[in-house]
Structure formats: structure tokens, C-alpha cells
């Protein structure tokens, strides 16, 4: 079974192009059911096999916002191993390259954490994967700074940062051995494309 990547997308562009994608998702009943990416590719007439575009996954949430200046479509996908960005790039090509696509991908199993941000939608520096006591049940949360993630860990464990730099402390936390083998707290920094 593949590891699951969760990717958050922020899509802007011309009102016509953004509305096209949003209206398509609405017709496919987004927010009522999962929208499988192969179905989305077929809707746009994309031969994903011929083009070697991965479509293993689905959109599980979307929302559209519009004001006088901006059309913004936000949605999240769950996909196998990595984000399926090539599908959305191909949809953009079909919509006359009128979309600006920003995204943040988190896949903790293979430690894939990256951001492509064409505006300022994803300023966060890192993602924390944590489970077990004294942390909550398995969760992945983004943090604005590595320092914020470190403070979260020190507040839960009672272990102080002391003279360690943030980099040294992050290494200390990532290598820390807990009494229970199922407990972990990993700070993973985003790569910015």
C-alpha cells in the first residue's frame, strides 16, 4: 500500500479559468464525495496514461472565494506517495495557462515536505508529525517557524532548549528516544521550490 500524501492547493488566475475548475468540481459533487483524479482528468479529456501523469488519489475538500480583485480556489488532495501536480499543470495548460497554482505537500512516511508558493499562501517553515504520550494521537501539523515547533515539544516534555541552536534542538528532538517505541515527534522542514 502506498504512503499517503496530503497536498493543499491555492489556485488563482483569471475569473474565467478559476471558475471553470470550480464549476467542474461542483458538478462532480466536491464536498459531498471524493473526486477521483482520474475522473477529473477524463472530464478535461486528458489521456493521463499516454502523458504519464499520475492520478492516484482524490480531492476531498474544496472552497471558492471571489472578490473584485481575486478568484481563489482552495482544495486538498490525498494521493499515493507524492502530489499529483502534473495533472493540475495539464488542466492549466488546457485553460490557456491562466491559473497560478500554489501548493504544499506533506507525506510523512517518505519524509516528503515541499511548498511551491506563487503568492504568500504557505509561509510555514515546517511540519510536525507526532504520536503517543505526551503528544496527541497521530497528527501532522504545520508551524510558522521551527522555533514554534520546538516550543511545542519543550512544553509537552518539560525538556528545555538550553544553549542549543534551533538546528541543534531540531536534531535533538528528531533523534530523541522515548520510553514507548510508538511515541515520536519529528520536525520536518519544507523545501521551497
Which stretches of residues belong to each language-model region?
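Intrinsic low-complexity, intrinsically disordered or marginally ordered coil/linker segments
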Residues: 1-193
Amino acid at each position: 500500500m502506498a504512503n499517503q500524501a496530503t497536498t493543499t492547493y491555492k489556485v488563482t488566475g483569471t475569473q474565467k479559468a478559476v471558475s471553470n475548475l470550480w464549476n467542474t468540481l461542483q458538478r462532480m459533487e466536491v464536498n459531498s464525495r471524493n473526486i477521483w483524479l482520474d475522473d477529473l482528468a477524463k472530464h478535461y479529456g486528458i489521456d493521463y496514461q499516454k502523458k504519464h501523469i499520475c492520478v492516484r488519489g482524490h480531492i476531498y475538500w474544496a472552497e471558492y472565494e471571489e472578490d473584485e480583485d481575486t478568484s481563489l480556489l482552495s482544495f486538498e488532495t490525498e494521493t499515493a506517495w507524492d502530489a499529483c501536480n502534473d495533472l493540475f499543470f495539464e488542466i492549466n495548460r488546457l485553460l490557456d495557462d491562466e491559473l497560478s497554482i500554489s501548493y504544499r505537500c506533506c507525506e510523512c512516511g517518505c519524509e516528503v515536505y515541499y511548498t511551491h508558493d506563487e503568492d504568500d499562501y504557505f509561509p510555514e517553515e515546517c511540519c510536525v508529525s507526532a504520536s503517543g504520550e505526551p503528544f496527541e494521537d497521530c497528527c501532522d501539523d504545520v508551524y510558522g517557524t521551527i522555533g514554534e515547533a520546538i516550543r511545542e515539544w519543550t512544553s509537552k516534555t518539560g525538556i528545555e532548549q538550553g544553549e542549543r541552536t534551533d538546528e541543534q534542538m531540531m536534531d535533538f528532538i528528531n533523534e530523541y528516544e522515548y520510553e514507548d517505541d510508538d511515541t515520536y515527534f519529528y520536525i520536518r522542514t519544507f523545501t521551497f521550490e
